[in-house]
Amino acid sequence: MLKRRSNALITLSRTKLFPITTVAYYHRRLLNQQRRAVSTSPKKEIKSLEDLANLDSLDGVDTELIRDLINEHTTKLNIKKELDMLKKFSQEEESGHEIPVKRFIRPLWMFILMGSSVYLLLHFSWWKLEHEERESQLKKEVEILEHQLNELIIQDKTHNTSRGKGSNESTHMKPWYRRWFW
């Protein structure tokens, strides 16, 4: 059995009868296959996976080279994904530090509406109390004025009755314009 590591061939034999002849046979056979594969394959240098994709077959290509190219490409992709993830985390962190205004618009409107409704309610109750107080003051003034008017009417009646007995009733019957001019 042959194993390939980097650029050296390591031979292992599991048969104990003819170990030397089997090793030599396998060694020569593999070397011949490699020479044919190298001579028939195009002499391009394979540097990337795209170069491998352009080949017709992978018969003469070293498996370690393919493995290294695949690992290199996966490493590049992993690094790219990690960078994208780090950018995403940094953007989330920056956006986490900034407090969005949208977060406060609804509570601000709620506060304004609640505050204005409380203000209107208190203003209405204050206006109602002032109105009732003013109404009670005006009622008292009306009562005082009615009382004064009643007193004056009573005084006038008593004054007219005492004066009315001695004066002419005919003068009261004349119209006012005749009393002035005749």
Curated annotation (Swiss-Prot):
Keyword Transmembrane helix on this protein?
yes
Segments traversing the membrane: 108-127
Where, in residue ranges, is this chain on the Mitochondrial matrix side?
Answer: 46-107
Compartment(s):
Mitochondrion inner membrane
* Residues forming coiled coils: 128-158
Give a GO cellular-component term: mitochondrial inner membrane
Keywords for this protein: Chaperone, Coiled coil, Membrane, Mitochondrion, Mitochondrion inner membrane, Transit peptide, Transmembrane, Transmembrane helix
Its placement in the membrane is given as:
Single-pass membrane protein
| Extent of the transit peptide | 1-45
> Any ranges marked Mitochondrial intermembrane in the topology annotation, and which?
128-182
Q: Where does the source fall among the domains of life? A: Eukaryota
Instruction: Tell me, in one coarse class, where this protein mainly resides.
Output: mitochondrion
The record's similarity note reads: Belongs to the INA17 family.
Question: What is the recorded function of this protein according to its Swiss-Prot or TrEMBL entry?
Answer: Component of the INA complex (INAC) that promotes the biogenesis of mitochondrial F(1)F(0)-ATP synthase. INAC facilitates the assembly of the peripheral stalk and promotes the assembly of the catalytic F(1)-domain with the membrane-embedded F(0)-domain.
**Oligomeric form and interacting partners:** Component of the inner membrane assembly (INA) complex, composed of INA17 and INA22. Interacts with a subset of F(1)F(0)-ATP synthase subunits of the F(1)-domain and the peripheral stalk.
Protein name, UniProt field: Inner membrane assembly complex subunit 17
